[in-house]
Amino acid sequence: MWTRRAFKVALAGAVADVTLSARAAAVDAAVRPPARAGIEGQRRADLGDGRYLNPIVPGDHADPTILKDGADYYMTFSSFQACPGAVIWHSRDLVNWTPIGAALTRPIGTVWAMDLVKHAGRWFLYIPVLRDEGTGILVVHADDIRGPWSEPVDLRIPGCIDPGHVLGEDGRRYLFVNGGRRVRLADDGLATDGPVEQGAWTPWKYPADWVVEMFAPEGPKLLRRGEWFYLLSAVGGTAGPPTSHMVTLARSRSVHGPWEHCPHNPIVRTRSADEPWWSRGHASVVEGPAGDWWMVYHGYENGFRTLGRQALLEPVEWTADGWLRALGGTLDRPLAKPRGGQASPASRPLSDDFAHGPLGLQWSLHAAGADDAGRVRFEDGALVLKGKGRSLADCSPLACVVGDRRYEVTVELEIRGEGHGGLALFYDERGHAGIGFSTTQMLTYGYGQEHTWMREAMATRHVHIHLVNRDNVLTWRHSHDGGTTWTQHPWQMEVSGLHHNVFGGFTSLRVALFSAGAGEVRARNFTYKGLPA
């Protein structure tokens, strides 16, 4: 049954489709060069000719924090309600990235923009979280970047997010946080050494007539170069209008200030909705393999907010007067790769036969509870997902991030018990679309609810489901004879409105397997394929 909220969501998607797909088509025709297909047809940044085309990590990889350690680069991103979370990625050329492990293996809350640090031979990950009691910052540490990582330690600084670690000229460690604040750390980095200080830095303010989401000073990231400390931060809001987010720069000869703003602020900003990347911001700067300099940040792809904020790489240079200048323009075309890097495979296959464990790094449970790890096991050559909740909305589905504008997915499912399960595109509890099966019927989810009027009697335990997503239009098929013959679902869903500007949450529309009710679903042969634009 349609509700007022469901109608509004549907209308939002329809309006978005008319306006955004037109802009996206214009951008495709005008500036988007063809991407290079990588593993499984996924788009790949490395074009194979000495150039790359953004994004470097496609799909929902927001708030990048990056660290150079010799010839190696490591990066991680906000993981929100995903568990496992805080997946660490590795590269040797800044363009080709591979996931190597997860720093968080149990749910701790909603994980936002982190800071990855190496100090005195030990790795630290400072983690802002949102929990029932509010926001705060935790820290985990490890002697090896690949783990194991420690249990989280609460720094007990409520209301703080977006940590940026720096070692001051006084030899003390500090975390700069949102809102122009900072706190001194103990020498071991596992506790604070004093109160949160107000007014440690003053965010740069844009002109009043600029079209942004809100002021929202956040994401301080610091580095020391020569006699200067540099502080990058974001203002303008991370979503909202395409021209919202931006990168600003300040510097000081002391970690204690005073800080002076770059006369060329903002050094990165989306200035028009016609650009290929919207709301660019939340940057970190890193030295390249050959000594040149690069900036990583996130942005929404024009017309595809459903993919989330994707990781982007832009060359920068130091000016004669000691400021940073961005060199990539609107990122509308291929750029020369960093010099001197070692080519490495960019591989994150999403396909999974589920023949045995452990669970691949592409998978995570959404909004998992403390006991949800026990819902997933491997048995008889299948992944077994125990039912939870009553529907797709409240069952904590098993999801993976996708980064292609067009793709197809196929999975084989066996339904056991009194529940139901299936395949979905899942944003959150309020925004999702999918089809599911019990042993007696097929169920349809759209615009965040099950449409009972579309229930269809269907006695089966084994089903193959096939999903095609072409530019946010979904087509479903199902087969009950092992994939020999297929039946197309009567509803082709348009989902361009299932994103942060409608629902909040900052995440993306992910492919998900779900199991609801008093039963379990056995999954085999999950296959993913990116489709050409």
Q: What are the functions of these language-model segments?
A:
Residues 1-2, 6-20, 25-533:
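Carbohydrate-active catalytic/glycan-binding domains of CAZyme proteins
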